[in-house]
Amino acid sequence: DEKQLRIYYMPKALYIDPNETLRPKDHELKLPVIPVMKYNKTVKEELKEGNFTKEDLLRIYRDMSYIREFETMLNQVKTTGGYNGVAYNNPGPAHLSAGQEAAAVGMAYCLDTDDFIFGSHRSHGEILAKGLRSIQILPEDELKKVMEEFWGGATLNVAKKAYDGDDTKELGIRFLLYGAMAEIFARTTGFNKGLGGSMHTFFTPFGIYPNNAIVGGSGSIAVGAALYKKVNRKKGIVVANLGDGAMARGPVLEGMTFASMDQFNTLWE
């Protein structure tokens, strides 16, 4: 493929013709109506319309349950010093997102391993959701290779100790849950050897890129990752998971501005 290098120079003087710039037709911006809170279907309706299979919906519910229990575990460890009778002290941060499981799992359901996610300081749920989705769609031989080659199998070996079955997908789930938990608890068997912690965990084989302690920080980083994909003609999209408060932060507005400057032709559909 031909690659072109374009060099732009800042002009010393730029004449602006009022007759061209201030044309009446340019004085009006028209935006389409954006529907809000329009979804209102039951599980039975979704099944009847063929949008999901029963297995799809059960898996979605299972993933939501995993995330809720994971966050419940972290909260109990933080507030009571233990979980299910096992004493443990976690002096590190634990920014939870209990109640937002559907948003994380719904996002991940639409993605594959070529898609990237970036998050916030409350991204445990998104990490688990994307990981569970990747485990579901990856061929077993590829999943096994990912687990065996990651840190020389250090994380996998711990997960194996608590599982004597031969289901690769089930082992993958245990690998994911343990790797994320060990990272939050600053263990060397965590996904980032305990150096990322709760707010900077990532696992790139599943398309999970670092979440960010800076509120809204992923808003501009994700745009850069998307531009990388476009320039290099890589598959997939990039998702920045942010809270409503982060939408007013500088990095998010910068990301939107950058994305609208003709680097991308479509922001959303």
Segments and roles (model prediction):
Residues 1-103, 143-145, 155-156, 163-164:
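Conserved acidic/glycine
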